[in-house]
């Protein structure tokens, strides 16, 4: 992001491509032993969706120079069209939503719910999307000594 911020401050048009958000050749899941070979890194759908391409550190005039964001999929490890689709989808849907949704209107929960519809379109089209979005995610609260219990919440797509 630093390079894009500097360019905007110098009044250059900027397309943001921060690798930790939009490099789609990174693994889309932590379960890499079942994944096709990738360059490394970890970039799940939720991380792509969390991108805010217009950094808050810029003033209003500087923000005008941020004209968008771009996803990158370097293909040195991509061996087929099916693998290319797998690495792109549904992360490309998340990046699209980042681009056309105002930050105040973004909602990860709403986007997760819309993924069910998007996936039905992928199925009709016969494209190979990443099924890792169905993995079960666990969240937990660390208890205080007085509580003596741990609350674990399990969720998956649309739940």
Walk through the language-model features, giving the residues of each.
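Substrate-binding groove of N-acetylhexosamine-processing glycoside hydrolases
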Residues: 1-158
């Amino acid at each position: 992001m630093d390079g894009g911020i500097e360019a905007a401050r110098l009044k250059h048009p900027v397309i943001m491509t921060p690798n930790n958000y939009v490099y789609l050749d990174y693994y889309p899941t932590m379960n890499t032993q079942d994944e096709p070979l990738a360059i490394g890194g970890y970039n799940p759908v939720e991380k792509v969706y969390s991108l805010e391409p217009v950094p808050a550190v810029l003033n209003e005039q500087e923000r005008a120079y941020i004209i968008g964001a771009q996803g990158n999929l370097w293909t040195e490890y991509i061996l087929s069209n099916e693998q290319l689709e797998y690495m792109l989808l549904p992360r490309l849907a998340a990046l699209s939503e980042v681009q056309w949704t105002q930050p105040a209107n973004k909602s990860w929960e709403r986007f997760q719910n819309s993924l069910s519809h998007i996936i039905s379109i992928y199925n009709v089209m016969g494209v190979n999307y990443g099924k890792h979005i169905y993995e079960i995610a666990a969240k937990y609260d660390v208890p205080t000594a007085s509580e003596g219990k741990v609350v674990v919440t399990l969720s998956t797509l649309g739940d």
